[in-house]
Every structure is written in C-alpha cells, then in structure tokens.
Amino acid sequence: MNDKSVLSCRNLSKSYDEGPQSVQVLSGVELNLLPGERVAIVGSSGSGKSTLLNMLGGLDTPSAGSVWLAGEELSALNETARGLLRNRALGFVYQFHHLLPEFTALENVCMPLLIGRTPIAEARQRAAELLERVGLGHRLSHKPAELSGGERQRVAIARALVNRPQLVLLDEPTGNLDQHTAQGIQELMLELSRSLQTSFLVVTHDLQLAGHMDRILRLEEGRLIAA
C-alpha cells in the first residue's frame, strides 16, 4: 500500500454461495484513497457498492485480497482491535440515520467519544460544538422522533465526524431525502470535508453529489473503473 494512504485495498474479491453455485460480486478491486481526498463510487443497483463499502470499513470479510485502514491491515487484527480502529479512524453515514431513538441528538453524537473513553464532560462539549457547526445547536436535547429527516441526517454526520476520523464512509447519504434537503446535506458534507481535511468515500446514485467529488469510480461487473 501507499504509506500516505488513508485507505487502500488490493485484489479485493467477494463471492457468495447460492445453493450449489458461487456468485462473484466483486473481483480484483483496487483502490487507494489519500488524506483529504473525496471519491464517489457509482454503479447500478445490485452491483456490489454497499458490499464493497462494508468490506472497506471492516464490517464484512473479503473472500480474497487485503484492506489497509490508517496503515493497519484489517485481516491482521482481531475483532476487538478492528472495532477500536473503526471507532478511531472511521466515521459512517448511511441512507437511514441509525440514530438510537431513546437518546437525544447530543447523546447520539457523544457515543463514539464515550466508546473511545473520552471523559463525559469533554465528550458533551465536543458533541455540542459539532452539532452547532451543522446547524443544530438549538436541538441538542431533541430525540430523533422530534427531528426532521434532514436534521436526523445532520446528527448522523456530526456523529460520524465527532472523533475526528481520517475517513468517512457514506452509503447513499442523501438517498432518503427530498431534493431541497439533499442539496443542503450535500453542501454541508463538502464544507466539512474541506475544513476538516477528512477523506470521504461516497457510494451514491446521485450524480450531482458524485460530480462534486475529486474522483468518480464506477463499479461494473465486479471491478472499479474510472467513470
């Protein structure tokens, strides 16, 4: 891997057994992501984009090949070490926010910090500052059910960034939002990526969002190619 890479994979493949047959989803995927770089992955539904993102984030195991995150080869780590690395170096944003419904916006954003054993007072301060930055300083004590769809996604973005990760993986981050709200979320993500120098890897069907990235890659027949 490139020593400067935030994320790298080599010859990454994934297949599933369906009865007596083996279905190849990904084949020989190669990717290198540099600090502060923003990359979009596009492709048809069912092409394996989410599967690839899960393997790059250490949430799924490849059938072959290797993934390096922040200089660590994921396959060389045990489950506990992988979890700690994910919490430290990665943020995740999904199409659905996956906020914990019983906790407030502030408490949801605090979670990655508390998992990393940040003192509670510091965690709350950092979470509040980031929620202010995403325009939700007045909604700290609101639970997800009391927030709009766009507000929930802003909380999810704040949660992904609160640990100051090197990389954020985003799976259709605007896919569940109306066009106006999606535009606001898109502008917020780009501003935060630039100002925090955080790398973004975005899986999306939104070609407008993809067009704002530094590079666009297409997943086609199990391989990544330049779009």
From Swiss-Prot:
InterPro entries the UniProt entry points to: AAA+_ATPase, ABC_transporter-like_ATP-bd, ABC_transporter-like_CS, ABC_transpr_LolD-like, LolD_lipo_ATP-bd, MacB-like_ATP-bd, P-loop_NTPase
PROSITE patterns: ABC_TRANSPORTER_1, ABC_TRANSPORTER_2, LOLD
Cell compartment(s), UniProt: Cell inner membrane
Annotated EC: 7.6.2.-
Enzyme superclass (EC): translocase
SMART domains listed in its UniProt record: AAA
Listed GO CC annotations: plasma membrane
UniProt: ATP binding residues: 43-50
Domain ABC transporter positions: 7-227
Topology in membrane: Peripheral membrane protein
Pfam families hit by this protein: ABC_tran
Keywords assigned by UniProt, alphabetized: ATP-binding, Cell inner membrane, Cell membrane, Membrane, Nucleotide-binding, Translocase, Transport
Single GO term (MF): transmembrane transporter activity
Any Gene Ontology biological process: lipoprotein localization to outer membrane
NCBIfam families tied to this protein: LolD_lipo_ex
Function noted in UniProt: Part of the ABC transporter complex LolCDE involved in the translocation of mature outer membrane-directed lipoproteins, from the inner membrane to the periplasmic chaperone, LolA. Responsible for the formation of the LolA-lipoprotein complex in an ATP-dependent manner.
Quaternary organization: The complex is composed of two ATP-binding proteins (LolD) and two transmembrane proteins (LolC and LolE).
Family to which this protein belongs: Belongs to the ABC transporter superfamily. Lipoprotein translocase (TC 3.A.1.125) family.
Descriptive protein name: Lipoprotein-releasing system ATP-binding protein LolD
Gene, per the UniProt record: lolD
